[in-house]
């Protein structure tokens, strides 16, 4: 028999009143006796504190505080301690006779909250002789000691050999070890279990019926429904496993997706930035080198530009000076041209005016003659008109006079008188005194002849006068011509001057004829002179460019030299062009090769990465495609072997699962048909009756019953007889045993127990010898033990299966990876390294570029030399034809000479042009200049005299004519003849008057016409004279202007002036063009120099900046590389294929990954902060830190239970495999969902029956309990009506509610809750979830109602309530219930602890004085029968004859309080004489 563990002693150190006090505890009852405040409750509080050191539960109050909601602020513990370190320990001897000291170190915490610090500890292996007080204190004098702190206690125990000290940070661990060592009856897994235990201790401490316990008797007394729970687990195991698997799949998928997403995006984010910085660093280096080269080249270019600027400035200065001269010359030429053009226009005007004057002079002479003739005609017409007028007047007067004559005589007398008067007038005029009418006619002829003669003489004189007038006009004209040509000259010198002019005229004509040849000659010489000057200018420029002076005679030799040099340079330039083309073609070919290799490099790098990953994952070195194919064959072979092994393990696992399923059947029935048969026969399976046997008894009973252990116990076999014949589905052997299932025992067999076997005597002639089975399966404990072993074996096989599945998946994925590698990368994976080739080609490219640069510089120099030579040769080609000009030194003299001759010729031509016509006019009339016609006045006088004589002759002739005409009048001497004469005279007079009037009219008309014509001729003459004078004045002015102009206007002067101006204009334009070109070139050069200087400054700034960037980038890069290498992520980040991407593409890639990462890490504060910090572009190392943080985070997230790697990238691979395995397990477990609601109902019903039986057995132990009027205590167990209805429906009417249990959306628990609600609609479910309600319905304890009843006096059995019982009766009844609970806990926990451990039993009772002596005796009897220890407290000694009694007296000595303790062994025990155990405690 296993001996029960006992509490040996209780030790208090530094408690209020107890410095170091050990209470030895009695094996049954320990009584603490003493007055109020003696320390009884403090002692019990120390025991409870050591037993349950949970400050959330401890609350020590007085009995008067029972039921109070609040006590002292410190819950009664702080005030029971003294300052400093305090201890409360329990010394225990367990069933294994091991000494265990458990306890707590307590210490007050300063502060107004009055807190207490508790540290539980345990000591094992302590020698029996050593007392706890010796261990916890240290003597510092004869009568003084100090309390050891916990660390010193630990050091002291460490020095003891074989002693183990353990300090606990968790109350759960403390209680777990106490349970394993048998100190406490129940495993306290949680705070709820601790609370139950504390409530039990508290209820026993304060006594009475605890409402906290009675309300929760089901939780205290009824164990968890392991049978129903197991059945439910069988039913929902697959569901739960499926859910777990689904959750695992979901978590794994989430982890995989998270891993893959984070790894992918973080790798893209960081590696893109990493490679971008690597590329930028390389770019910075290249840029720095390029900038340095460009800086040096710019310095050289600036020096060249400065030299060019100086040369062009010098040339510009020269050209500017020449430009001023050319501008002056051009302006002078333009002015000269303008003057020549003005002179030409003036000369044209002069010529025109001279022509006009000559024409006017001719017209004037003609008009003068016309006017003179018209004057003479007018005078004649005037005389005629006057004579006609006189004749008319005379005739009119005669007619008038004739009218006055009244008679003929008178008229005749008048006529006669008139005739006489006419005769007298004729005589007077003719000076003929002897003139008579008779001889008048003779004298008329004489005088008419005389008149004729006078007229002829007048005409002669008139002709002479006309000739004289003409001679005078010619002289004047000749004289005027000479004056016009020579100027003012005397009339006497005119002849000599005219002769000289005419003498010089031929020579001047000869000179004038030479003007054009001279002008052409001069133009030719001037052109030659200009060409000579240009040639000299070219020669000077050529010498300046050559930097050496050359003479004209040296140019031909220099030309041949330059031609040879040009030919050599031309060949060199052509060869350099071909060489440069070849080099460029080579560069282009290299560039194309680099481009092709660059395009192939990422593919090759990706193939190499894949190949290296395959090599790392498989641990194989693959050097060729043959190695790859051979290894793929090996993978196929390994896959086949692993698949075969996996299938074998799967078969073993299925076999084990069948065994587990068979052993997991309810009531221990291996055949499910037995349960149905037991229900049909109204019996109970034998295995169900013996379901609670211990594992130690299982072999015996298994051998005892043999094959009948699977039989059915029925109340009456005769009632079963009728059912046997109708059985259709039953096992081959069916054992039926008659007996009462409620009180069945093994008395049905006559058996003898032997060593590891049982001999069963069925009859005298039939024995059965059954050995103990090696693996007993009879009884729940044995089955559970076997199930545990099978589960372990199944777990081992499952793990092996998972490993093999993992290996198969891994091999398959490896083969798939190899297949993908073969399909994608095998063609390029084993090619030569393109990057090495790229490096070699780039090096060659750089060398070629350098060579090409040097060659181009040489070529540029040669080209410049060739261009200079070509320009020099061009200049020489222009100079060579003009060498003779350059050597002609007399050209200027000849030009001056010809220019002088031309001036003379032009002067002669100009003189002839001006006076040629005058000379031509002068030549025929030069002779008139010899004599001056001074007799012109005398001749004019003779003419006037002759004119008067002719007029007189006319008058005389007219007078004679009149006399002749009046000759008849001389006959009117008689009066007889006067009338007839008057009539004839009248007629004649009238006729004559008419003729005279007509003559007068005609004469007037002629005179008027002549006057008009004369006036017109005079006007024409006047206008001609005016025009002549005006033109003559204008001609004088023009001559004056020509003199003022001072330019000879010949025919070619304008052409020469224009050619000269045009030449100078061209020269000036060329000069200006050159100046503009030079200015532009200088401006461009200055701009180029400025830009070069700016470029130099910028290049220097950029170079220093890029150099600083290179230096800082190098420092940062070193830090980054150090961080990368230290954390081993270089392989992940240094993705060489990214080196071939542009910076923009890498930045875009990093930005896209950044956006995805922001979403991915939004729920992770650490990664979110790291990502936010990593966004700083100036701190690239933070991106590495972020990547490391991601790796660390993912390493922490790796589920080590399913993934066997620390690398997140490898974890992704394993996750893929694990997903496939978990999915396969899910499919397999779904097939296990095969239990009905009827089975669950049967399990719950059987469990309820079993627990009812157990309660009945507990009731049997309490039936003899007696307290006061109470004669017994029992527990009533009833099934709730609503729950019983649920069981009936589950058993018999489950088909009606399959809609709930077959629903894919509802779990079995939820279906149970829905069914319960459907059956009991009146029950209010509140806010609880169907899952929670269903889980409660699967717990059999919720189907039962427990009530405590007492048998009290005449009332019989009634419900135990404090109000219906006395205090003592209530305390006793409550104690009985607590004992029942403790027993129930021990039975429930029997399978959980060691089989050689029987736990301690101890309860408390404060204020036990409320019980009478008989009740106390009952308690003592109960403790003895149940092997239970009891600590009671009372003011006075209770039953001192039994147990151990301590008398406590609290004393105060010198302000020092202590408790005086006296211990007394009970004298009624089988021990020596009463023993005094007294010890004064300081």
From Swiss-Prot:
Residue ranges, annotated region (Flexible hinge): 666-783
Source organism, top-level taxon: Bacteria
Localisation per UniProt entry: Cytoplasm, Nucleoid
Signal peptide positions (record): none
Biological process terms in GO annotation: cell division; chromosome condensation; chromosome segregation; DNA replication
Listed GO CC annotations: cytoplasm; nucleoid
One annotated GO molecular function: DNA binding
Residues that bind ATP: 34-41
Subunit structure: Homodimerization via its hinge domain. Binds to DNA via its C-terminal region. Interacts, and probably forms a ternary complex, with MukE and MukF via its C-terminal region. The complex formation is stimulated by calcium or magnesium. Interacts with tubulin-related protein FtsZ.
Record function comment: Plays a central role in chromosome condensation, segregation and cell cycle progression. Functions as a homodimer, which is essential for chromosome partition. Involved in negative DNA supercoiling in vivo, and by this means organize and compact chromosomes. May achieve or facilitate chromosome segregation by condensation DNA from both sides of a centrally located replisome during cell division.
Domain remarks: The hinge domain, which separates the large intramolecular coiled coil regions, allows the homodimerization, forming a V-shaped homodimer.
Record-given protein name: Chromosome partition protein MukB
Encoding gene, per UniProt annotation: mukB
């Amino acid at each position: 028999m296993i001996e029960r563990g006992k509490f040996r002693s209780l030790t208090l150190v530094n408690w209020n009143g107890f410095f170091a006090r050990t209470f030895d505890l009695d094996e049954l009852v320990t009584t603490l006796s003493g007055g109020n405040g003696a320390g009884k409750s403090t002692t019990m509080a120390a025991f409870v504190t050591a037993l349950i050191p949970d400050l959330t539960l401890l609350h020590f109050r007085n009995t008067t505080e029972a039921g109070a909601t609040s006590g002292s602020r410190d819950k009664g513990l702080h005030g029971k301690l003294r300052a400093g370190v305090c201890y409360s320990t329990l010394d225990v001897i367990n069933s294994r006779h091991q000494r265990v000291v458990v306890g707590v170190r307590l210490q007050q915490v300063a502060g107004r909250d009055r807190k207490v610090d508790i540290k539980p500890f345990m000591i094992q292996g302590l020698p029996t002789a050593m007392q706890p007080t010796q261990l916890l204190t240290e003597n510092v004098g004869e009568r003084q000691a100090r309390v050891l702190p916990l660390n010193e206690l630990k050091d002291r125990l460490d020095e003891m050999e074989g002693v183990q000290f353990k300090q606990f940070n968790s109350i759960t661990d403390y209680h777990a070890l106490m349970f394993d060592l048998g100190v406490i009856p129940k495993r306290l897994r949680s705070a709820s279990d601790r609370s139950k235990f504390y409530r039990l201790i508290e209820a026993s401490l304060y006594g009475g019926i605890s409402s906290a316990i009675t309300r929760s008797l089901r939780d205290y007394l009824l164990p968890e429904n392991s049978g129903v729970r197991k059945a439910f687990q069988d039913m929902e195991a697959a569901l739960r496993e499926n859910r777990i698997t689904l959750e695992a799949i979901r978590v794994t998928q989430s982890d995989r997706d998270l891993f893959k997403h984070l790894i992918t995006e973080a790798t893209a984010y960081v590696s893109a930035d990493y490679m971008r910085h690597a590329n930028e660093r390389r770019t910075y280096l290249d840029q720095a080198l390029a900038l340095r080269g460009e800086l040096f080249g710019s310095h050289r270019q600036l020096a060249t530009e400065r030299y060019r600027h100086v040369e062009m400035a010098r040339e510009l200065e020269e050209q500017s000076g020449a430009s001023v001269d050319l501008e002056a010359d051009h302006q002078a030429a333009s002015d000269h041209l303008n003057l020549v053009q003005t002179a030409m226009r003036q000369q044209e005007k002069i010529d025109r005016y001279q022509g006009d004057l000559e024409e006017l002079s001719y017209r004037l002479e003609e008009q003068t003659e016309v006017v003179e003739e018209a004057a003479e005609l007018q005078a004649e017409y005037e005389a005629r008109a006057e004579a006609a007028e006189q004749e008319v007047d005379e005739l009119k007067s005669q007619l008038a006079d004739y009218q006055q004559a009244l008679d003929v005589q008178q008229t005749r007398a008048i006529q006669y008188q008139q005739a006489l008067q006419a005769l007298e007038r004729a005589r007077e005029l003719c000076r003929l005194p002897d003139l008579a009418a008779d001889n008048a006619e003779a004298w008329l002829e004489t005088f008419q002849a005389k008149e004729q003669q006078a007229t002829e003489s007048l005409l002669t004189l008139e002709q002479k006068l006309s000739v004289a007038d003409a001679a005078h006009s010619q002289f004047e004209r000749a004289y005027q011509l000479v004056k016009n040509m020579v100027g003012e000259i005397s009339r006497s010198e005119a002849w000599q001057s005219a002769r000289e002019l005419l003498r010089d005229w031929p020579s001047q004509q000869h000179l004038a004829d030479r003007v054009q040849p001279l002008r052409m000659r001069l133009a030719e010489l001037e052109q030659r002179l200009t060409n000579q000057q240009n040639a000299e200018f070219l020669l000077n420029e050529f010498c300046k460019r050559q930097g050496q002076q050359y003479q004209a005679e040296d140019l031909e030799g220099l030309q041949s030299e330059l031609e040879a040099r040009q030919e050599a340079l031309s060949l060199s330039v052509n060869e350099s062009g071909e060489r440069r083309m070849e080099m460029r073609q080579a560069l282009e070919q290299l560039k194309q090769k680099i481009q092709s290799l660059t395009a192939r490099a990422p593919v090759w790098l990706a193939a190499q990465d894949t190949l290296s990953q395959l090599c790392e994952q498989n641990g194989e070195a693959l050097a060729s495609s043959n190695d790859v194919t051979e290894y793929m064959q090996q993978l196929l072979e390994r896959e086949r072997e692993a698949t075969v092994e996996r299938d074998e393990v799967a078969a073993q696992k299925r076999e084990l699962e069948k065994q587990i399923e068979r052993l997991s059947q309810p009531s221990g029935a291996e055949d499910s048909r037995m349960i149905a048969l037991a229900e049909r026969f109204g019996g109970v399976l034998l295995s169900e009756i013996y379901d609670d046997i211990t594992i130690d008894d299982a072999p015996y009973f298994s051998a005892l019953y043999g094959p009948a252990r699977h039989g059915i116990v029925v109340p009456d076999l005769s009632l079963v007889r009728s059912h046997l014949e109708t059985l259709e589905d039953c096992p081959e052997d069916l054992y039926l045993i008659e007996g009462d299932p409620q009180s069945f025992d093994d008395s049905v067999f006559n058996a003898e127990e032997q060593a590891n076997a049982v001999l069963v005597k069925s009859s005298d002639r039939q024995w059965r010898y059954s050995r103990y089975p090696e693996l007993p399966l009879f009884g729940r404990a044995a089955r559970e033990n076997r199930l545990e072993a099978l589960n372990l074996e199944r777990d081992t096989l499952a793990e092996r299966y998972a490993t093999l599945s993992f290996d198969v998946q891994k091999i398959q994925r490896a083969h798939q990876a190899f297949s993908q590698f073969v399909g994608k990368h095998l063609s390029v994976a084993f090619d030569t390294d393109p990057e090495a080739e790229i490096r070699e080609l780039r090096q060659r490219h750089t060398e070629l570029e350098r060579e090409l640069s040097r060659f181009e510089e040489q070529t540029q120099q040669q080209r410049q030399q060739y261009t200079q030579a070509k320009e020099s040769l061009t200049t020489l080609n222009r100079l060579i034809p003009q060498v003779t000009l350059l050597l002609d030194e007399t050209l200027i003299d000849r030009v001056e000479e010809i220019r002088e001759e031309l001036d003379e010729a032009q002067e002669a031509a100009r003189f002839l042009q001006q006076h040629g016509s005058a000379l031509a006019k002068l030549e025929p009339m030069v002779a008139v200049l010899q004599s001056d016609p001074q007799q012109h006045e005398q001749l004019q006088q003779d003419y006037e005299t002759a004119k008067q004589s002719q007029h007189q002759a006319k008058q005389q002739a007219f007078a004679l004519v009149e006399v002749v005409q009046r000759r008849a009048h001389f006959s009117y001497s008689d009066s007889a003849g006067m009338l007839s004469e008057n009539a004839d005279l009248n007629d004649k007079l009238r006729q004559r008057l008419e003729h005279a009037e007509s003559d007068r009219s005609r004469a007037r008309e002629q005179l008027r016409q002549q006057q008009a014509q004369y006036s017109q001729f005079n006007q024409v003459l006047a206008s001609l004279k005016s025009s002549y004078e005006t033109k003559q004045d204008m001609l004088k002015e023009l001559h004056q202007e020509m003199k003022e102009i001072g330019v000879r206007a010949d025919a070619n002067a304008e052409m020469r002036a224009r050619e000269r101006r045009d030449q100078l204009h061209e020269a000036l334009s060329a000069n200006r063009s050159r100046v503009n070109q030079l200015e532009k070139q200088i401006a461009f050069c200055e701009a180029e120099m400025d830009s070069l200087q700016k470029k130099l400054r910028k290049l220097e700034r950029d170079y220093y900046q890029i150099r600083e960037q290179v230096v800082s980038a190098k420092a940062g890069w070193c830090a980054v590389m150090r961080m990368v290498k230290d954390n081993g992520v270089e392989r992940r980040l240094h993705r060489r294929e990214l080196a071939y991407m542009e910076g923009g593409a890498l930045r875009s890639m990093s930005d896209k990954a950044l956006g995805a990462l922001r979403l991915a890490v939004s729920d992770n504060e650490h990664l979110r902060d790291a990502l936010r910090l990593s966004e700083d572009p100036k701190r690239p190392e933070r991106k590495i830190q972020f990547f490391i943080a991601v790796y660390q985070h993912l390493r922490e997230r790796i589920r080590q239970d399913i993934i066997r790697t620390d690398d997140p990238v490898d974890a992704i691979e394993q996750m893929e495999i694990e997903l496939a395995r978990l999915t396969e397990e899910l499919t397999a477990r779904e097939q296990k969902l095969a239990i009905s609601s009827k089975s669950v109902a049967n399990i719950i019903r059987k469990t309820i029956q079993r627990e009812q039986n157990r309660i009945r057995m507990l009731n049997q132990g309490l039936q003899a309990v007696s307290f006061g009027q109470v004669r017994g205590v029992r527990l009533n167990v009833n099934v709730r009506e609503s729950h019983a209805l649920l069981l009936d429906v589950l058993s018999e009417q489950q088909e009606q509610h399959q809609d709930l249990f077959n629903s894919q959306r509802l779990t079995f628990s939820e279906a149970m809750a829905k069914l319960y609600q459907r059956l009991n609609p009146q029950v209010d479910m509140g806010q609880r979830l169907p899952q929670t309600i269903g889980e409660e319905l699967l717990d059999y304890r919720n189907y039962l109602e427990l009530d405590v009843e007492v048998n009290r006096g005449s009332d019989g059995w009634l419900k135990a309530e404090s109000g219906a019982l006395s205090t003592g009766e209530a305390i006793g009844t409550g104690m009985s219930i607590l004992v029942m609970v403790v027993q129930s806990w021990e039975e429930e926990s029997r399978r959980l602890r060691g089989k050689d451990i029987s736990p301690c039993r101890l309860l408390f009772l404060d204020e036990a004085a409320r019980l009478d002596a008989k009740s106390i005796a009952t308690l003592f009897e109960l403790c003895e029968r149940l092997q239970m220890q009891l600590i009671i407290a009372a003011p006075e000694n209770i039953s001192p004859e039994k147990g151990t009694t301590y008398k406590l007296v609290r004393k105060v000595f010198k302000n020092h309080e202590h408790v005086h303790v006296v211990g007394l062994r009970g004298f009624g025990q089988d021990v020596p004489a009463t023993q005094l155990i007294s010890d004064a405690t300081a």
